[in-house]
C-alpha cells in the first residue's frame, strides 16, 4: 500500500548551525535533536522532486523543492532544509559542506485579484550522495 508522500512542512537551519550531522548508510542521516530549526510558512502541499543521472560515469542526485509562501524569503544562501512528508518521513536537503542548496524566489504580481499572489520559492540541491531521510 502506498502512503501519501506530500510535503506538509518545511523547516530550515543555517549550515553553520546544523548540529551532529552524521550519515548512516546510503540514504539515512542523524541530526542532533538540539538543532534549532526555523519553521517556514508554506502553502501545503509543497513539491519535492528527487532524481538521479549519470554524468561522466558518476551518479549525480538532484533534489528540487518548490513551495509557496506568504512571506518574502530573501535570505536563501547557505541554508539546509528539512521536509516533512505526510507519511512521517523527514528528508534533508543539503549538508554543512559544499555544495549548498541554491534558492530562488519568484514574486507574483497578477493582474487579477483572485490569482495566486504568494511568492514561489525553488530550492535546488545537487550531490554525489543520495538525498537522505532523517532518522
Pin down the residues of each PLM region.
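Solvent-exposed edge beta-strands and adjacent loop segments
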Residues: 1-64, 99-113
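Generic detector of leucine side chains in alpha-helical contexts
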Residues: 18-19, 40, 48, 65, ...
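Sequence-level detector for tyrosine residue identity
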Residues: 21, 61, 81, 90-91, ...
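Oligomerization/assembly interface segments of phage tail-like spikes and tubes
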Residues: 49-72, 115-129
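Short, acidic/charged, Gly/Pro-enriched secondary-structure junctions
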Residues: 70-97
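Mixed-charge, glycine-accented linear interaction segment located at domain edges/termini
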Residues: 98-135
Amino acid at each position: 500500500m502506498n502512503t501519501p508522500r506530500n510535503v506538509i512542512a518545511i523547516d530550515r537551519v543555517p549550515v553553520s548551525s546544523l548540529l551532529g550531522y552524521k550519515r548512516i548508510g546510503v540514504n539515512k542521516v542523524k541530526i542532533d535533536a538540539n538543532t534549532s530549526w526555523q519553521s517556514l510558512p508554506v502553502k501545503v502541499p509543497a513539491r519535492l522532486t528527487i532524481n538521479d543521472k549519470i554524468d561522466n560515469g558518476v551518479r549525480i542526485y538532484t533534489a528540487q523543492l518548490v513551495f509557496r509562501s506568504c512571506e518574502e524569503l530573501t535570505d536563501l544562501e547557505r541554508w539546509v532544509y528539512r521536509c516533512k512528508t505526510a507519511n512521517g518521513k523527514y528528508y534533508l536537503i543539503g549538508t554543512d559542506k559544499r555544495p549548498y542548496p541554491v534558492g530562488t524566489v519568484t514574486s507574483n504580481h497578477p493582474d487579477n485579484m483572485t490569482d495566486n499572489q504568494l511568492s514561489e520559492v525553488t530550492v535546488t540541491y545537487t550531490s554525489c550522495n543520495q538525498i537522505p531521510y532523517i532518522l
